[in-house]
């Protein structure tokens, strides 16, 4: 499974990259605008920072077919390996996905609100499909829709990977990971919640207190004895 960060905050990525195995970064127009930086600066920072094996996902902004292709080619040209252009599943988007795949570009179909939308993008050859899990829940059973999509892809032998996005809580993430999802992309706050169970802190504090009481120090080795 691929574990990806959904953010344009490079410092947040660096911090989590030291703690966990991070497979890449996703961005979108809204996330980039919240960075307070120019888009060219944000993209350049990540192109320079990410390791070759880490994936980078950047979304087109234009809704015009020809301009979508132009933006997609520009994005992939900045970092030819392991860069994927994100294309919303509009009518022009489906057309662009089909064309870009014929040119050999990596494509993630995004802004997906139903299993049917995702399935059609998979038929066009999209490498990744990004269902907006929590937003789908606002219209019905979002988790169930993703389960349906997993079955649809398997039944018809399609190789697109599901990169689940738009999570509100860790319960949604847990449900999809447990079901065998291909990939998730998460904002840093959700990631920290996943690793921050209060019971862990209590247990560590109890271990430390017992050790200090018995040995009068906070380390395994008694350095003064060397």
Region spans (language model):
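Catalytic cores of alpha/beta
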Residues: 11-19, 67-71, 75, 96, ...
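C-terminal alpha-helical cap/extension of soluble enzyme domains
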Residues: 153-226
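Alpha-helix-loop-beta-strand connector modules within alpha/beta enzyme cores
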Residues: 40, 44-56, 78, 94-106, ...
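Conserved, mostly hydrophobic/aromatic
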Residues: 28, 85, 121, 176, ...
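Glycine-rich phosphate-binding active-site loops on the catalytic face of alpha/beta enzymes
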Residues: 29-32, 111, 128-139, 180-200
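Glycine-enriched alpha-helix->loop->beta-strand junction motifs that scaffold or abut catalytic
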Residues: 20-24, 79-81, 99-108, 123-130, ...
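Active-site beta->alpha loop and helix N-cap motifs at the rims of alpha/beta catalytic domains
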Residues: 2-14, 19-22, 26-99, 133
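Active-site-adjacent beta->alpha loops and helix N-cap segments on the catalytic face
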Residues: 34-45, 64-70, 87-102, 114-122, ...
